[in-house]
Swiss-Prot record:
Pfam families: Fumerase (PF05681), Fumerase_C (PF05683). It comes from Escherichia coli (strain K12). InterPro entries: Class-I_Fumarase/Tartrate_DH, Fe-S_hydro-lyase_TtdA-typ_cat, Fe-S_hydro-lyase_TtdB-typ_cat, Fe-S_hydroAse_TtdB_cat_sf, Fe_dep_fumarate_hydratase, Fumarate_lyase_CS. Catalyzes the reversible hydration of fumarate to (S)-malate. Functions in the generation of fumarate for use as an anaerobic electron acceptor. To a lesser extent, also displays D-tartrate dehydratase activity, but is not able to convert (R)-malate, L-tartrate or meso-tartrate. Is required for anaerobic growth on D-tartrate. This is Fumarate hydratase class I, anaerobic. One of its GO terms (biological process) is DNA damage response. GO terms for molecular function: 4 iron, 4 sulfur cluster binding; D(-)-tartrate dehydratase activity; fumarate hydratase activity; metal ion binding; protein homodimerization activity. Binds 1 [4Fe-4S] cluster. It comes from the Bacteria. Keywords: 4Fe-4S, Acetylation, Iron, Iron-sulfur, Lyase, Metal-binding.
Length: 548
């Protein structure tokens, strides 16, 4: 066997970058000559300013292309009424968030930075530190949330109080530019990243497509669809596969070629992307509460692989599609242009439109009366809640379990009021609350039967589908799970939440137990006291309302 000649293949050969940028400043950059080459000198302040501005913009604004996809739902005759309702709420939320006070989502995410530094770019070193300072500045100065926990030992944690550390991955490349992708990645969508170790046997058209559709179905609605879904097939390692998933979901690899070659270049399979998008529309899950728009788009990327391995990765970017490019070149610091005026996509006739029929529910009365009212309505019923709600999420539930385990009574407020799974962002001056949308319900599933057996958590409010144990617990104890739209945290803070106060564990920050007063807070009955589960009915094709 003759040896093949050496040929270097760039693993991700990209086409032209068509991103539209704006010039932040021409300060902090200069050029110099060294060893016959022109060098771009970048001051440390440039990296700090770039990171600070990029994460500020991404926290309050989204890409124009994404907003146009949301707006298109309103004009699609095949979209369900629930699809259109959710899309309208997203646009209203974006219009509020774009003012720069209330962030798009209360989970303002882990700050992730991917940087590609040209060999003729000099910064003097310490890039991770100066970029981290920019992240710090944004999270400290804006009304964002601190979501990062530092481990003091294997089991004890403390909130870092700054949202640091950031995840920063820097690469050396050719050229005289420094290019970045900045991602504010919330926990809900990050948790929908999966790796499947498969074999060559999967690589037939029928098997692969069916496999991907079934995996796509398992995403559920907990990470706030409509999604930007990414599949990656192959990879020289598992970690390469998942890195590619992350970047593909951010549309970073959109300019890849659309066919492979014998040297192993990555490519997009645009035909399979379209086929999978059509399958996603048939799932019935829609934009959270049934319909067509489970996904805005799908990316499928094929990578080379070791003959003994076939990793398959899946991930999403959620409705808070907070991805933004930036770069530094001779002209200065450039930031990707996001949509400053998302309100332009709201049709005038929907400006003052009501929300359609919703059952009014007064929460300021005995729990038995509230439960009796809810019991009159089927799953999928839209509700409008007014009154007192308790707010608590992961650590709060662990604390409540500790009380029961210690033989103590649950606090009366857990018995008297619904509990909303959420953690607020910082409260801006003059506002009753910071952005406060729901977190993923499924993480609290294991607590439901225990709490309800002790008279607490009888009405739960959160986002996404839940496990059978929650349906069983609600059937057994007469409880309900109500769904809140995942994503429009700013509009909830501005329009529905009238008061916020901490009632327990203030040292836990966003994980504390809070009390809110709400007015016309939107929700849907998803699990009732009779053993019905809205999402299971969709799967079983039994929900008559989900595709109207």
């Amino acid at each position: 066997m003759s040896n093949k000649p050496f040929i270097y293949q760039a693993p991700f050969p990209m086409g032209k970058d068509n991103t539209e940028y704006y010039l932040l400043t021409s300060d902090y950059v200069s050029v110099a000559d060294f060893d016959g080459e022109t060098i771009l000198k970048v001051e440390p302040e440039a990296l700090t300013l770039l990171a600070q501005q990029a994460f500020h913009d991404a926290s309050f604004m989204l890409r124009p292309a994404h907003q146009k996809q949301v707006a298109a739902i309103l004009h699609d005759p095949e979209a369900s009424e629930n699809d259109k309702y959710v899309a309208l709420q997203f646009l209203r939320n974006s219009e509020i968030a774009a003012k720069g006070v209330l962030p798009t989502c209360q989970d303002t995410g882990t700050a992730i930075i991917v940087g590609k530094k040209g060999q003729r770019v000099w910064t003097g070193g310490g890039d991770e530190e100066t970029l981290s300072k920019g992240v710090y500045n944004t999270y400290i100065e804006d009304n964002l949330r601190y979501s990062q926990n530092a481990a003091l030992d294997m089991y004890k944690e403390v909130n870092t109080g700054t949202n640091l550390p950031a995840q920063i991955d820097l690469y050396a490349v050719d050229g005289d530019e420094y290019k970045f992708l900045c991602v504010a990645k919330g926990g809900g969508s990050a948790n929908k990243t999966y790796l499947y170790q498969e074999t060559k046997a999967l690589l037939t058209p029928g098997k692969l497509k069916n496999f991907l559709v079934e995996k796509m179905r398992t995403l559920g609605t907990a990470a706030c669809p409509p999604y930007h879904i990414a599949f990656v097939i192959g990879g020289t390692s598992a970690e390469t596969n998942l890195k590619t998933v992350k970047l593909a979901s951010a549309h970073y690899y959109d300019e890849l070629p659309t066919e492979g070659n014998e040297h192993g270049q990555a490519f997009r399979d645009v035909q399979l992307e379209q086929e999978l998008l059509e399958e996603a529309q048939k799932l019935g899950l829609g934009a959270q509460f049934g319909g067509k728009y489970f996904a805005h788009d799908i990316r499928v990327i094929r990578l080379p692989r070791h003959g003994a391995s076939c990793p398959v990765g899946m991930g999403v970017s959620c409705s808070a599609d907070r991805n933004i490019k930036a770069k530094i070149n001779r002209e200065g610091i450039w930031i990707e242009k996001l949509e400053h005026n998302p309100g332009q996509y709201i049709p005038q006739e929907l400006r003052q439109a009501g929300e359609g029929e919703a059952v009014k529910v007064d929460l300021n009365r005995p729990m038995k009366e509230i439960l009796a009212q809810l019991s009159q309505y089927p799953v999928s019923t839209r509700l409008s809640l007014t009154g007192t709600i308790i707010v608590g999420r992961d650590i709060a539930h662990a604390k409540l379990k500790e009380l029961i385990d210690a033989g103590k009574e649950l606090p009366q407020y857990i018995k008297d009021h619904p509990i909303y799974y959420a953690g607020p962002a910082k409260t801006p001056a003059g506002y009753p609350s910071g952005s406060l949308g729901p977190t993923t319900a499924g993480r609290m599933d294991s607590y439901v039967d225990l709490l309800q057996s002790h008279g607490g958590s009888m009405i739960m409010l959160a986002k996404g589908n839940r496990s059978q144990q929650v349906t069983d617990a609600c059937h057994k104890h007469g409880g309900f799970y109500l769904g809140s739209i995942g994503g429009p945290a700013a509009v909830l803070a501005q329009q529905s939440i009238k008061h916020l106060e901490c009632v327990a564990y203030p040292e836990l920050g966003m994980e504390a137990i809070w009390k809110i007063e709400v007015e016309d807070f939107p929700a849907f009955i998803l699990v009732d006291d009779k053993g019905n589960d809205f999402f299971q009915q969709i799967v079983n094709k039994q929900c008559a309302n989900c595709t109207k």
